[in-house]
Amino acid sequence: MPINRIAIGTPGEASRPDAIRAAFAEFFSMVIFVFAGQGSGMAYGKLTGDGPATPAGLVAASLSHAFALFVAVSVGANVSGGHVNPAVTFGAFIGGNITLLRAILYWIAQLLGAVVACLLLKVSTGGMETAAFSLSYGVTPWNAVVFEIVMTFGLVYTVYATAVDPKKGDIGIIAPLAIGLIVGANILVGGAFDGASMNPAVSFGPAVVSWIWTNHWVYWVGPFIGAAIAAIVYDTIFIGSNGHEPLPSNDF
């Protein structure tokens, strides 16, 4: 079970050069992701005069977040693992793939990156507000929690299958693309209901800059639960001592 591999970390680990570099990688990847993802929504709102939400707007949000996350994960992968998401980091911690001390360092970097990206957007757009995540009419907080659990489960399961699994073989090279695509697909599913965050930092940045915290807890509880379930399920079934055998590379 992954719970047996959970580690706090060693004294001084957070100050090691490799850990500091990894934190910077997470920070800059998050700035790239949030600036492009949140910024695309602001640009769409400006072009449409902040009119009502439309299917075209949802598709645009899906594509922009998918492309931006693909890039953000790719540029950080060789330094920090390209988590770009506190929930992904939590899933890696639950699976014993990162220590708690390094996870905390990642969380700080990710949250700061999201806030900086939103501040940059506010300044560069002449004071436009970054849109805080919110629930649509008729959607209760617990509806949204379930949405976030399921969507984040799919995301972190994809991360484990394409990036964490030591038996992933050649399919590992498509990890950033697969991660971006599952986020884009989930936005098409949940965007009209709760904004489809799957990422506490993505929700935190706009909340800080706009200072709107209504139901903000939803975007932490749901993703962290979904990430933990995905990590435990994938690690227990596929990475454990009696896990699967990798397919020959020519089968991909």
Curated annotation (Swiss-Prot):
It comes from the Eukaryota. Gene3D superfamilies: Glycerol uptake facilitator protein. GO terms for biological process: urea transport; water transport. Induction: By dehydration. Not affected by water stress. Keywords: Acetylation, Membrane, Repeat, Stress response, Transmembrane, Transmembrane helix, Transport, Vacuole. The chain crosses the membrane at residues 23-43, 56-76, 115-135, 144-164, 171-191, 220-240. A motif (NPA 2) lies at residues 199-201. One of its GO terms (cellular component) is vacuolar membrane. Residues 1-22, 77-114, 165-170, 241-252 are cytoplasmic. The modification N-acetylmethionine is found at M1. It is found in: Vacuole membrane. CDD domains: MIP. GO terms for molecular function: urea transmembrane transporter activity; water channel activity. InterPro entries: Aquaporin-like, Aquaporin_transptr, MIP, MIP_CS. The keyword Disulfide bond does not apply. A motif (NPA 1) lies at residues 85-87. It is a multi-pass membrane protein. Residues 44-55, 136-143, 192-219 are vacuolar. SUPFAM superfamilies: Aquaporin-like. Potential aquaporin, which may facilitate the transport of water and small neutral solutes across cell membranes. Aquaporins contain two tandem repeats each containing three membrane-spanning domains and a pore-forming loop with the signature motif Asn-Pro-Ala (NPA). PANTHER family: AQUAPORIN TIP1-3, AQUAPORIN-8. Interacts with cucumber mosaic virus (CMV) Protein 1a. This is Aquaporin TIP1-3. It comes from Arabidopsis thaliana (Mouse-ear cress).
